[in-house]
From Swiss-Prot:
Phosphorylated. Its main location: nucleus. GO terms for cellular component: nucleus. A motif (Nuclear localization signal) lies at residues 4-11. Coiled coil: none annotated. Specifically binds 5-hydroxymethylcytosine (5hmC), suggesting that it acts as a specific reader of 5hmC. Residues 1-54 are annotated as: Disordered. Keywords: Nucleus, Phosphoprotein. This is Thymocyte nuclear protein 1. It is found in: Nucleus. The lineage of its organism: Eukaryota, Metazoa, Chordata, Craniata, Vertebrata. Residues 14-24, 45-54 have a biased composition (Basic and acidic residues). The keyword Phosphoprotein applies.
């Protein structure tokens, strides 16, 4: 989650989290900043149709949220924010700011206090699930959209009609073992052929999104992998 960003001269790079992102292998990479980082630009193809009938939309209560654990400088700001950065914040809590994709934003608007999310490391040497966090504050206005010095400043957003929102998250725990993207992809491909909970997982079907919903079956299956040997 992003707390605040660190201004820097030029150093390692990491992540700009705009909800657009790079493809990690077959997937994605959203960036974000944590107080120091967050997500940035929106990908047109990911923008949700605002006219969709809400009544037809499925309801989710579990999530996967991506952030960059390795340093990356964007406009003089290090957008790095990994799970260790979240753990280091007061009360191990921070705001997930910088999301600049409509669909990802809309998913955050659906989040409720107490719901769980996987902290996913993206745009790094080994992307994958690092730990668990929970939502501790529901969607509210993301102040970084109005800050001209912020990497995620959006001049088209107005104070009386803000476009972007964020939630607060709190670290819960690390997974017993890091669950890499490569392993998840193997299960996804297998489940597409033979059937299984990860056959339609958004990590692969909507890879560009930095904030993704999970079904109960997907969440429980992925979490169970921490007790299994890597494949």
């Amino acid at each position: 989650m992003p707390p605040r960003k660190t201004r820097s001269s030029a150093k390692s790079n990491k992540h700009s989290d705009a909800d657009a992102h790079l493809n990690e292998g077959s997937d994605d990479v959203a960036q974000r900043k944590t107080g120091k980082r967050k997500r940035s630009a929106a990908v047109k193809g990911d923008v949700e149709n605002k006219n969709d009938d809400d009544a037809c939309k499925p309801s989710y209560s579990r999530w996967l949220m991506k952030s960059e654990p390795e340093s990356r400088i964007e406009n003089g700001v290090d957008v790095k924010f990994g799970i260790e950065d979240l753990k280091a914040l007061p009360n191990q809590t921070g705001c997930w700011d910088g999301v600049r994709n409509y669909q990802a934003r809309n998913f955050m608007r659906e989040m409720k206090v107490g719901q769980q999310a996987f902290f996913y490391h993206s745009n790094c040497k080994e992307p994958g699930i690092a730990g668990l966090m929970k939502i501790v504050k529901e969607a509210y206005v993301d102040h970084t959209q109005f800050d001209k010095k912020d990497v995620h400043y959006d001049p088209s957003s107005k104070a009386d009609n803000p476009k972007w929102h964020m939630v607060d998250v709190q670290f819960e725990r690390m997974v017993k073992r890091f669950i890499p993207l490569a392993e998840l992809k193997k299960y996804h491909l297998e489940h597409r052929v033979k059937g299984g909970p990860l056959k339609d997982m958004a990590l692969f079907t909507r890879a560009r999104l930095s904030v993704q919903p999970l079904t109960a079956e997907e969440f429980e299956f992925v979490l169970s992998l921490e007790n299994e040997d890597p494949i």
